[in-house]
Amino acid sequence: ALGAPLSGEALNSLVYEVEQLHHGTPSGIDNTVIVYQQPVYFVRGVPPETFHVGAPLTFLVIDSGVSASTRETVGDVRQLYTRDRAHYGAIIGEIGEIVRTARALIESGGALEELGALMSANHDLLRALSVSSAHLDRLCAAARDSGAYGAKLSGGGRGGSLIALVEPDLAPSVAAALRQAGAAQTWLMQLT
């Protein structure tokens, strides 16, 4: 009815439609996380699963200062996959396995070192899919070199944002190193 609040599912569907107008082929992750306001395990075509964090995690969210077209990046990945389904399908499969393992670690409050290593491995695989850029790679390296457990691009790639898993007391020095390496801004985020 007009004026009645929308269910989470209905709101998620509407926000996704808006994302389609803007991006062309959005993943559906952004709208899902925003609507449900908690960690979400997302697989396209499957109802999203929210989950709990076993122990607080501290991240730096990093603005690379570079904008890039998600539509173009997705199109380029699609072309790579079409040219060599076996090779790029294997990379996508590895990313899926990393995500499943990372979810289990997050839920159990698992080892930060292992979670950080998974983030960095995920970034490397995204680079192999042409989703990263030299600037994003430099920022990930700067985060790790200054004490982050791991770092990876987030979103459409080739620009935009990255995330780095850090100890709370190291966040200021990691943020400073990132700004020195060319990050436009950083924000501290606690996931609980």
Give the predicted meaning of each segment.
Residues 2-6, 13-23, 31-152, 163-192:
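C-terminal nucleotide
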